[in-house]
Amino acid sequence: MERTLIIVKPDAVQRGLVGEVLRRLEQRGLRFVGLKLMKVDREVAERHYAEHRGKPFYEDLLAFITSGPVVVGVVEGPRAIEITRKTMGKTDPAQAEPGTIRGDLALTIGQNVIHGSDSPEKASYEIGLFFREDELVSYERAIDRWIMG
């Protein structure tokens, strides 16, 4: 079973969109196995965005993700990364398809509602940044046998 990390960013928390974002992921058949409201400190933000260090927008990324509370979650399911990425839509909401989270809810490329890991390696790394293993809960929903076989 594949797992991936999602972050409902400060803009979405401030706009009251957390429930809508989580609902859309659950409706795609994904199961939340970890979920928490938190403030990201600068050290974690730097580790999370390490690949962007040195880029012109790096400091803005850090300032934004540490500017207010976020909701961090781990979802699992077959092809969880692919399904999450398609449900999110393109990074730039102006290019995201209607019906995607970003296409419907995001305002700008800098305030685009949600982050999702883009590979199994990144998912594993990012999950480890935000969750201890004992914070992840495996369980079966009644509907899982219909979705996951």
Curated annotation (Swiss-Prot):
Its EC number is 2.7.4.6. SMART domains: NDK. Signal peptide: none annotated. InterPro entries: NDK-like_dom (IPR034907), NDK-like_dom_sf (IPR036850), Nucleoside_diP_kinase (IPR001564), Nucleoside_diP_kinase_AS (IPR023005). The keyword Transit peptide does not apply. Its cofactor is Mg(2+). One of its GO terms (molecular function) is metal ion binding. ATP binds at residues 9, 57, 85, 91, 102, 112. It is found in: Cytoplasm. PROSITE patterns: NDPK, NDPK_LIKE. GO terms for biological process: CTP biosynthetic process; GTP biosynthetic process; UTP biosynthetic process. The active site is at residue 115. PANTHER family: NUCLEOSIDE DIPHOSPHATE KINASE. Belongs to the NDK family. This is Nucleoside diphosphate kinase.
